[in-house]
């Protein structure tokens, strides 16, 4: 599996020839200069509706024809705008061509602004993706929560993408607990350093995980 990290919470996967992109935030992302219109994912997975997770959804979906996978409310919003969608809800799973996706809970919020009015778009979520090669967990934006222990018991997680920025999500201390509960073989910190309130020392976080910690520099593709 090839994994590309674009900074913040935007992660791309190439799985058996299928391209998946999670939470496309590129245009305003200070960690990347990638032109979102050049990306051609087959699927766009959205954890929630905040701007820093969906900024480039429409641009990329128009250019690529990607199917948008999101909570029912958010998927319905994009479906009414003419996009191909697959709606899900917390606890549900579906077998896609690249693997089985389970939508997990996340403790956060999920809205975007329509004019001056914030509109809520269902629950925030995370994704556990089981492929022929690896099992990956993208936690989305979340606090630490006890069901992560159950995820670690039920799934053999190879790579976990965990937010460490604090303030809006869990910080490094709670993310270390999450890493232990999940029993993930590798842990990649995300959602840090994009804005001043979420400035963190990601290398120090990884050092505390020893060989399990994996710091991926933005705009880098690695093979796992």
Curated annotation (Swiss-Prot):
Do you know which Pfam families this protein is assigned to? Lactamase_B_2
The UniProt GO MF terms for this protein read:
hydrolase activity
* Top-rank lineage group of the source organism: Bacteria
SUPFAM superfamilies to which the protein is assigned, alphabetical: Metallo-hydrolase/oxidoreductase
Q: Which InterPro entries match?
A: Metallo-B-lactamas (IPR001279), RibonucZ/Hydroxyglut_hydro (IPR036866), UPF0173 (IPR022877), UPF0173_UPF0282_UlaG_hydrolase (IPR050114)
Keywords in alphabetical order? Hydrolase
Which family is annotated? Belongs to the UPF0173 family.
Please state what the protein is called: UPF0173 metal-dependent hydrolase EAT1b_0495
Q: Which organism is it from?
A: Exiguobacterium sp. (strain ATCC BAA-1283 / AT1b)
């Amino acid at each position: 599996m090839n994994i590309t990290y674009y900074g913040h919470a935007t992660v791309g996967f190439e799985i058996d020839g299928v391209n998946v992109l999670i939470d496309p935030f590129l245009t305003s992302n200070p960690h990347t200069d990638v032109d979102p219109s050049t990306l051609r994912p087959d699927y766009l997975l959205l954890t929630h509706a905040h701007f820093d997770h969906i900024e480039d959804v429409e641009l990329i979906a128009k250019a690529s024809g990607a199917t948008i996978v999101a909570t029912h409310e958010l998927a319905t919003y994009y479906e009414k705008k003419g996009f191909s969608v697959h709606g899900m809800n917390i606890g549900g799973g579906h077998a896609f061509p690249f693997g089985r996706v389970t939508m997990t809970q996340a403790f956060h919020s999920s809205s975007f602004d329509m004019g001056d009015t914030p509109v809520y778009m269902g629950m925030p979520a995370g994704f556990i993706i089981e492929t022929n090669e690896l099992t990956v967990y993208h936690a989305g934006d979340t606090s630490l929560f006890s069901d992560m222990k159950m995820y670690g018991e039920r799934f053999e997680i190879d790579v976990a993408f965990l937010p460490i920025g604090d303030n809006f999500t869990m910080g490094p201390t709670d993310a270390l607990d999450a890493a232990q509960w999940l029993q993930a073989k590798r842990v990649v910190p995300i959602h840090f350093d994009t804005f001043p309130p979420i400035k963190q020392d990601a290398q120090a976080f990884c050092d505390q995980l020893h060989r399990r910690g994996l710091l991926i520099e933005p705009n880098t593709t690695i093979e796992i």
